[in-house]
Amino acid sequence: RDDFGIRGIALSWTLRNTGTEEVEKVAREWAVESRESRTVEGVHPFSPALLGAPSGSIIAIRAQTTDWRKDAEPVFSRVIQAEIVSIEAHAELIRARMEDLLSRLSEIARLEENVLIETLKLEAMDPDKAAEESSKRKAEETAEKQEDLAKQLGSMGKEGMENLRQAMKNPVFEEQTLKEWSETMQAMEELSEGKMQEASQQLSQASSSSSQSERNENLSEAENTEREILEEIQSLQGEINERLDDLEATTLAQRLRRIKRTEDDLGESLAKNL
């Protein structure tokens, strides 16, 4: 945006980290005829392959604009740096991110077990102790812990889906593999929005129950729901473990193929020089 009217904009790029001289090149320019234009937008596709950007290099992109003032100097945007990675490195990055999700899911399982233990302790209280205000607060705190775990798991499911959207850009990953992963991430989100929320509500209701029998009923329901949650988390862990093994095999095979291509290229180069 320029209050003096935009005269033109340009998009430029610089290839870095290649061991050669860095030269900024203009990718595209847009001229603006009207002096009244205060805001201008431009779209230009970028292809690392067409730019000759090898794996490990960086493409630095920035825009510039000039207005209609006499002798106006161009104004530059901030530089956006795009790191170029090979499909093998990208596949390994996706695999590592999903492996991190499994590690965090194990922590969710541990904390869910703690919630179940707290629920069992609340159930085991004698009526006099259960009627105390401190016990009611404890039930509400446990409900809040359950709610927090639900939010964490839901966030992890969304993160996993974003990883899969990135994986769709990589030809290494087969459509069926991505579909199976998507189903697992969706199950994770459904668990966070369903039974985990349900358990939190049951615990909260137990904290505000007007009678001992109502409290016991809510706690019993919460216990059953929490046990079901743990079973589903364990099932998710098994699915993710199995799919990580498949991803490991896929990325390893891709790396071996790349090594073979490199060896073949070196062999051809040596043969030409002999």
Model-derived features with residue positions:
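Extracytoplasmic/secretory ectodomains and luminal regions
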Residues: 1-274
